[in-house]
Amino acid sequence: MRGIRSLPCWAPGLSTKRIPPRELFADLFPNACVISARHSARNGLIRQFSGCSGSISNSCNPRPYRSAITSLLSANVCSKGVSAVQPRFLSTVRLFSTSQRSLEPKSNVKSTGGQVVRPELHQDQEHEDIEKGFELSERAAQAAQVNLSAKLAKDGAAGKKAGFKEIWRLLLIARPEAKKLALAFLFLLVSSGITMSIPFSIGKIMDTSTKATTEGGNELFGLSLPMFYGALAGILTLGAAANYGRIIILRIVGERIVARLRSKLFRQTFVQDAEFFDANRVGDLISRLSSDTIIVGKSITQNLSDGLRAAVSGAAGFGLMAYVSLKLSSILALLLPPIGLGAFFYGRAIRNLSRQIQRNLGTLTKIAEERLGNVKTSQSFAGEVLEVRRYNNQVRKIFELGKKESLISATFFSSTGFAGNMTILALLYVGGGMVQSGAITIGELTSFLMYTAYAGSSMFGLSSFYSELMKGVGAASRLFELQDRQPTISPTKGEKVASARGPIRFENVTFSYPTRPAVPIFRDLNFEIPQGTNVAIVGPSGGGKSTIASILLRFYSPTEGRVLIGGKDITHMNAKSLRRKIGIVSQEPVLFSGTIAENIAYGKPQAKRSEIVAAARKANCQFISDFPDGLDTQVGPRGAQLSGGQKQRIAIARALIKDPDILILDEATSALDAESETLVNSALTALLRGNNTTISIAHRLSTIKRSDTIIVLGPDGRVAEQGSYEELSARPDGAFTKLMEWQMSGGEVMDQLANTPANPVAQETSWDLQSDDGTEISEDTNIPSEPRTID
């Protein structure tokens, strides 16, 4: 809040030295004159100008100035009315307002013929203030310093520079399936060899048929024609069987690789720390686990097989073409360099487009996952059209990228196809002349043309193989980045925890969230919780109450200082075994799809049925008996089939079944009705008499009173107060007393200040004024909210 020394910039003639109260306010309100006024009008003005009075009283010696403004407001207004005073005074109110701005327009009044009405005088200024919204505070500047080192790159760690290293690593994924892939490759050689023998056989058949017509021959390769055709049919059948074996082996291997990839990546994702999930969107992770793994699996199985088949067929085709005619082969060789160059640039373009498509598919998955997961909220605000439009906009982006990919593919394949057709035409022209000259036979020309078609098809196959391989490299680079990412807090390293009993001590703990390192949550936080006690942690919203639970669970590590349990630093403990000793019930409980029994047993997977029933009874889950299937009732996704209170009681049972050494209750009864809360609290009270240490993050007075010790967190990230309820309540000026008064008042005082005309949201909590003689001017509770006539 700006102080009284800023006055000279808007009040000419005033200096920063102390000014007598009457002179100061006489300068501020030159049109105020001393005539009698009604008490109600005076109180109306007191409400109107209370924001400034409180601000000035906080910046100066309060009593003289409060007396001065009381004297001025006790007087009547001269014939010019309030409107002559108010504009200048409004600037004073704005001067002393805090950085927080009210979202509601400021209410200004003027007098017209004795009737107070709302003027249009300051509408432009009010509109400008509303458009500005909230002024940024110093904390906002700190929050702007974002650390996203844990965020995965959109194109993977290698980005657009992915090359041979990524290709080799991609192929190594298939190493466990090497034997099956070798068998598939053997089948590939058999089927490709048989396929490539067909053109040669057809050429010989044509030459034999021509010779039989002219010379009467009826044998082929030393076999009669019927025997030759029978043998050829058997060979083709063998080729089909080999092709069948190749396809089915590769499909099975591909599915196995995809399943292994998904399992490994999901496990790697699940062990990441909280910083990782703070920085990455769930939709992008789902996209990597689903579509990216499919692309990679296809790339190293089916696509690899197609590429090898194209390579074998192409090599055999070019070799047999050279055997038939070197002259015709040299003509065909002229086509290879431009096709190879075009295939190279085509593959690069497809790789970049594939990355963009996968990135946008991740965004699309994120939109669908978030919106469908919160569909009731969208429907409650009638936001269906907005969300469908948002989804369609992303679909349109993917469509445009797909259209661009189609255009590039069509251009490449059509141009290479046209070049191939022109080459065939040239071969027919040259080959026809060679047949006429007797250099080659008609059968040899036919075989050569068929080998040309096979070789051309192989070239197309290699181009497709390269483009699909680049897609796989793009997807694999995204998977490798996730696979290589090591969590900052490993859940499996450290000393295993046999027991988490003992005092809990925070020693000089300083902490900021990793994604917002410049915004400190705690500064030299120190407190100790004795073993077996019930401690309530209270404080303002955003003060770090739930952060204490996150640090104890080792979701985050302190920036400075240390946290001890039983005298041992938790950073040296195995996080997974420590979490097994801690039970937590959050304010917004999360249930998983499955039965009630499965959700309760989630805290202890090997729990017996009797243990599940006992935990449910402790948590007052009698509502289970109202379901036809009892404990086997399906709760639906995220517990959608249950009410909020029912979900919370199941969450309490899930924590109790662990019999944890440390129980953290983060507003655990916030969703319960009064009767259920009483029953659950009774159960918790009986439970807490044991050796369990309980930390209650509380706002409700009933929870706070039940605690042995109360720790009050201050806005500066330190402990403001600590003690029992009786001790802290006995301190009238203590932080706990003020916090409780604020909560129990329901915010009425601040609401009154926020609704006061011409008073932006200010920090004052009391605005009683005093007259010159020291008597208080009390608030007139009968003043209506609408402006009244000033007599």
Curated annotation (Swiss-Prot):
Domain of life: Eukaryota
Composition bias, Acidic residues: 770-779
Single GO biological process annotation from the record: oligopeptide export from mitochondrion
Record: glycosylation sites: 147, 303, 352, 421, 508, 692
Bilayer disposition of the protein: Multi-pass membrane protein
GO CC list: mitochondrial inner membrane; plasma membrane
Keyword Magnesium set for record: no
Transmembrane segments: 182-202, 220-240, 307-324, 326-346, 422-442, 445-465
Induction context: Expression is up-regulated during biofilm growth. Expression is also induced upon amphotericin B treatment. Expression is down-regulated by tetrandrine and posaconazole in a synergistic manner. Expression is increased in clinical azole-resistant isolates.
Pfam family, one: ABC_tran
Record-linked SMART domains: AAA
Keywords: ATP-binding, Cell membrane, Glycoprotein, Membrane, Nucleotide-binding, Transmembrane, Transmembrane helix, Transport
Biased composition annotated in UniProt, kind: Polar residues: 754-769
Start and end residues of each ABC transmembrane type-1 domain: 182-471
PROSITE patterns per UniProt: ABC_TM1F, ABC_TRANSPORTER_1, ABC_TRANSPORTER_2
Chain residue ranges for the region called Disordered: 754-791
UniProt-annotated binding residues for ATP: 539-546
Predominant place of localization: membrane
Function description: Pleiotropic ABC efflux transporter that may be involved in A.fumigatus adaptation to azoles.
Family: Belongs to the ABC transporter superfamily. ABCB family. Mitochondrial peptide exporter (TC 3.A.1.212) subfamily.
Name this protein carries in UniProt: ABC multidrug transporter mdr2
Species assigned in the record: Aspergillus fumigatus (strain ATCC MYA-4609 / CBS 101355 / FGSC A1100 / Af293) (Neosartorya fumigata)
Lineage: Eukaryota, Fungi, Dikarya, Ascomycota, Pezizomycotina
Gene name as annotated: mdr2
